[in-house]
């Protein structure tokens, strides 16, 4: 009980002290999750309701908003907030008093949507700008009388910039499409948050390397420096990446995405013992059959390089669908045996959990790349980007699976799994140098593929917009290249 606007009402008394809260300095309403206790049974017969979510106006008595932080000299709104004995009505609970204790579900559903959009799209946009700028700059910048784009070392960095940007674009577009259709993709959102921000960091690093001295001198014409400085912010907020990789991606997906484990857990907790026993037996035998099927599929697909695996399309990307099928079966087999032999201890084996998460992530990202390619009309000129992206992702899945087996604590099980998963060894190869050269050509040559890769970047030709000015310089460079070549030849003579 407490006073609210002159009346005595039943409400909630809150205490909190949070250090790093995004938008806190400018917020008029705080979204607060807290554990709700009712020892006096004022709203029901329960002592502890658990996690509850409420909206608290920042002008409420007792709410303190601290000084704004200045993270890495970037204009990112973040700051502390605290509250001491803040009394608010029960109606401030999101959904009203009947939603007390249901805050965790709200948080997960909200995060499953927001986490898939905000930071991944920011990373994708940064990648598009970096790709567009780096491709043009590498052509314009001359070293030893030749464009640095012609140096294979620089080309290697340009390939990664373009390929990683394509992966981010695909992941964001496909996952956002699922959200538009009403899905709340908890596992894909965790995958996107981690991998898009990490790929964004790699793109920023490579773009800085390509630009060299131009990128490290701060000033009005430095279009990379601030973005490079801001990358750790995206890595940190909305769930630190180390935690996301080692616990969240596989930890959420193992039960949520498994066709039988969730049914087994629900049956085991059924209050009706007879019904629970029937459901558990049905799920258990289905699980056993599923494991045997995956063992056979994994062995056969690995032995035949998945050449006989049925796929929905007969296109130049057909083999990539087949390879995803192969590693999907291998992942399911490894995951089942990990849960069977390690049980609850698997969540403490964070290195193993992280590698399983890496495999799952690589397959999901490869799937989004193929879907994105289809959505954009199967443009043949984009095939080098698709091939580099999928090959890179599936090679990473293979290496993560190898590392998982190499470090699996039960060596007998690891040997058995290796026999079924890699009967011919690790046969999948990373992208070749020829593919990389084709990707470099796409990112450094004016054309549809270069424009599509950075289609959402602001490229208008106007004063103060470096992307538009770089593109104009690139077009002029291509137009006058024959004249420049004749001048160089005349100078030599």
Indicate residue ranges for each PLM-predicted region.
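A glycine-biased, small/acidic residue-tolerant capping/turn segment at secondary-structure junctions
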Residues: 204-228, 404-417
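Loop-to-helix element that buttresses phosphate recognition and phosphoryl-transfer chemistry
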Residues: 153-180, 198, 205-208, 361-372
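A short core secondary-structure module
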Residues: 7-64
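Terminal amphipathic helices with adjacent charged low-complexity linkers/tails
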Residues: 140-156, 374, 378
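Flexible, small-/acidic-enriched active-site or ligand-binding loops
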Residues: 61-87
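A glycine-rich, basic-preceded beta-loop-alpha segment at the flavin cofactor/substrate interface
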Residues: 82-115, 132-149, 171, 294-316, ...
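Charged, glycine-rich active-site and insertion segments that engage polyanionic ligands
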Residues: 183-215, 384-397
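C-terminal amphipathic alpha-helical interaction region
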Residues: 286-493
């Amino acid at each position: 009980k407490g006073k609210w606007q002159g009346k005595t009402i039943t409400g909630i008394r809150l205490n909190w002290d949070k250090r790093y809260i995004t938008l806190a300095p400018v917020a008029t309403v705080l979204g607060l999750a807290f554990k709700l206790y009712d020892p006096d049974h004022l709203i029901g017969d329960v002592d502890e309701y658990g996690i509850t979510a409420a909206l608290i106006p920042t002008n409420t008595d007792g709410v303190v908003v601290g000084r704004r932080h200045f993270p890495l000299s970037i204009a990112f709104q973040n700051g502390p907030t605290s509250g001491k004995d803040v009394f608010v009505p029960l109606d401030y609970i999101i959904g009203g008093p009947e939603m007390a204790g249901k805050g965790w579900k709200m948080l997960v559903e909200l995060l499953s949507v927001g986490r898939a959009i905000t930071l991944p799209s920011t990373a994708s946009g940064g990648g598009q700008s970096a790709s567009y700028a780096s491709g043009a700059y590498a052509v314009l910048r001359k070293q030893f009388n030749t464009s640095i784009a012609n140096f294979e070392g620089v080309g290697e960095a340009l390939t990664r910039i373009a390929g990683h940007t394509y992966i981010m674009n695909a992941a964001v577009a496909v996952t956002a499409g699922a959200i538009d259709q009403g899905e709340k993709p908890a596992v894909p959102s965790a995958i996107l948050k981690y991998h898009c921000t990490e790929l964004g960091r790699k793109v920023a690093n490579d773009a800085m390397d390509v630009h060299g001295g131009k990128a490290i001198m701060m000033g009005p014409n430095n279009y990379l420096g601030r973005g490079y400085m801001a990358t750790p912010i995206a890595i940190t907020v909305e769930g630190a990446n180390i935690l996301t990789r080692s616990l969240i991606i596989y930890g959420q997906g193992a039960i949520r995405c498994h066709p039988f484990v969730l049914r087994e857990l629900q049956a085991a907790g059924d209050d009706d013992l007879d019904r629970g026993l029937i459901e558990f037996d049905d799920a258990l035998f289905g699980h056993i059959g599923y494991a045997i099927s995956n063992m056979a599929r994994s062995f056969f697909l690995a032995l035949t390089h998945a050449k006989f695996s049925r796929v929905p399309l007969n296109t130049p990307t057909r083999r990539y669908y087949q390879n995803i099928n192969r590693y999907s079966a291998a992942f399911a087999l490894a995951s089942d045996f990990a849960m069977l032999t390690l049980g609850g201890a698997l969540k403490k084996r964070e290195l193993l959990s992280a590698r399983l998460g890496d495999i799952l992530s690589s397959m999901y990202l490869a799937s989004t790349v193929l879907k994105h390619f289809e959505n954009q009309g199967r443009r043949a000129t984009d095939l080098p980007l698709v091939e580099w992206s999928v090959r890179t992702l599936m090679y990473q899945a293979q290496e993560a699976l190898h590392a998982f087996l190499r470090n699996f604590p039960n060596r007998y099980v690891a040997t058995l799994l290796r026999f079924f998963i890699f009967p011919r060894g690790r046969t999948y190869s990373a992208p070749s140098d020829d593919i990389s050269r084709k990707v470099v050509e796409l990112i450094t040559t004016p054309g549809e593929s270069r424009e599509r890769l950075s289609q959402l970047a602001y490229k208008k030709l106007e004063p103060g917009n470096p992307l538009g000015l770089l593109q104009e310089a690139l077009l002029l460079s291509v137009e006058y290249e024959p004249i420049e070549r004749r001048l160089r030849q005349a100078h030599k003579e």
